[in-house]
Amino acid sequence: MALPDFSMRQLLEAGVHFGHQTHRWNPKMEPFLFGDRNNIHIIDLAQTVPLLHQALVTVRDVVAGGGRVLFVGTKRQASDPVAAAARQCAQYYINHRWLGGMLTNWKTISNSIRRLRQLDEMLAGEAKGLTKKEVLNLTRERDKLERAIGGIKDMGGLPDLIFVIDTNKEEIAIQEARKLGIAVVAILDSNSNPDGIAFPVPGNDDAARAISLYCDLVSRAVIDGISQSQSASGVDVGAEAEPAVEIPAAAEA
């Protein structure tokens, strides 16, 4: 495995360079902007390319060292790509709503995870001795918990890095990560606040193609990190009967 490659053309065709309307900008993003066209800010991809590469290197190195990565994207257009990318590389995700304290109050979240596992076991066992109403109520509780924390139920502890789509919407997640010293890789649109983002990646955070591209690249960087970790521990990845994770070819946008 190798760190995923990407081209300026891919970024352009995915619309990574398109920011928001000029009146919606955050002035702190000015250093990352190329200019504006038709009252739309244009993000400077000459900066995005090296910053995205550095972010991918960081993700790979964290995972190669045994770290966990949490994908965070709860807006509608990010929800599915975030979950799919995290599953593809055997990592973790929050893709519906960030619950306050999800990182800073991990003990409470752990209790909710234990309850979710308990419900899974109860309902998997054909719910013997339970009435239809009890089964319905337990199923509803399970589904609610699964939607909220299903993506982190196997995480086993705090993540070592979070990857964020839309820093404005995920402001609480970023605040919690910073408080705990957890590294943050984040996509910064023209209306974002870059303060406190250790690994900023200037780019459109609304276009579906752009979001899918970011998620795919980060997922493949994780897989490269897993491969390095296995190699370092003496596992012959090439000799495995089946690859642990199927890696799709990078889609040329």
From Swiss-Prot:
Keywords: Ribonucleoprotein, Ribosomal protein. One of its GO terms (biological process) is translation. InterPro entries: Ribosomal_uS2 (IPR001865), Ribosomal_uS2_bac/mit/plastid (IPR005706), Ribosomal_uS2_CS (IPR018130), Ribosomal_uS2_flav_dom_sf (IPR023591). It comes from the Bacteria. Pfam families: Ribosomal_S2 (PF00318). The keyword Ribonucleoprotein applies. The keyword Ribosomal protein applies. One of its GO terms (molecular function) is structural constituent of ribosome. GO terms for cellular component: cytosolic small ribosomal subunit. Belongs to the universal ribosomal protein uS2 family. This is Small ribosomal subunit protein uS2. It comes from Parvibaculum lavamentivorans (strain DS-1 / DSM 13023 / NCIMB 13966).
